[in-house]
């Protein structure tokens, strides 16, 4: 998962070094940061339902009803996102490889220690707030998922799940001679 940062301590240290640099450089400079990940990574989780649990000689696969088209960061950057089984949080821990429904490089996590997983369980991928919808695609004509906001214990649908009609709406029919 993401490593937490003491933003106040970091600010003090950077400020001191930056001010020294400006004196050395002989000019005041404006320094700006893009804090997107810091602000929103922890603000969202990604949930996916387990469709199949499959034991092989080398691992136990938990196949989820999603793929890199919804949450590409683990595949694109080989990033780690903690995964919990919210349907069975107190279950016995086992090791799983969590994979998606798209053939190519669709592995959310390999050899992860997760509370025992059964078909229909819901897995939670943590620190996903900055990486799902903004990086999602309609790869292989897959729909984009719904988005739900939870505020003070109440859930609100803030974006509907796509339909095939949503995908086709921007298509133009042309006649070729």
Language model features with spans:
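Charged (often Lys/Glu-rich) extended helix/loop segments that serve as interaction or gating elements
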Residues: 28-177
């Amino acid at each position: 998962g993401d490593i937490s940062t003491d933003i106040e301590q970091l600010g003090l240290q950077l400020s001191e070094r930056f001010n020294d640099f400006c004196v050395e450089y002989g000019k005041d400079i404006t320094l700006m940061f893009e804090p997107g990940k810091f602000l929103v990574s922890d603000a969202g989780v990604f949930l996916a339902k387990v469709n199949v649990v499959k034991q092989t000689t080398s691992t136990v696969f938990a196949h989820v009803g999603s793929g890199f088209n919804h949450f590409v960061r683990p595949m694109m950057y080989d990033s780690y996102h903690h995964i919990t089984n919210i349907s069975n949080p107190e279950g016995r821990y086992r090791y799983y490889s969590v994979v998606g429904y798209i053939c190519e490089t669709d592995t959310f996590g390999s050899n992860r220690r997760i509370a025992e997983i059964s078909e229909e369980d819901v897995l939670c991928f943590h620190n996903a707030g900055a990486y799902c919808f903004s990086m999602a695609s309609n790869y292989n004509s897959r729909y984009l998922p719904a988005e739900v906001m939870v505020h003070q214990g109440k859930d609100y649908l803030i974006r509907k799940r796509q339909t095939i009609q949503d995908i086709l709406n921007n298509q133009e029919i042309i006649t070729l001679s």
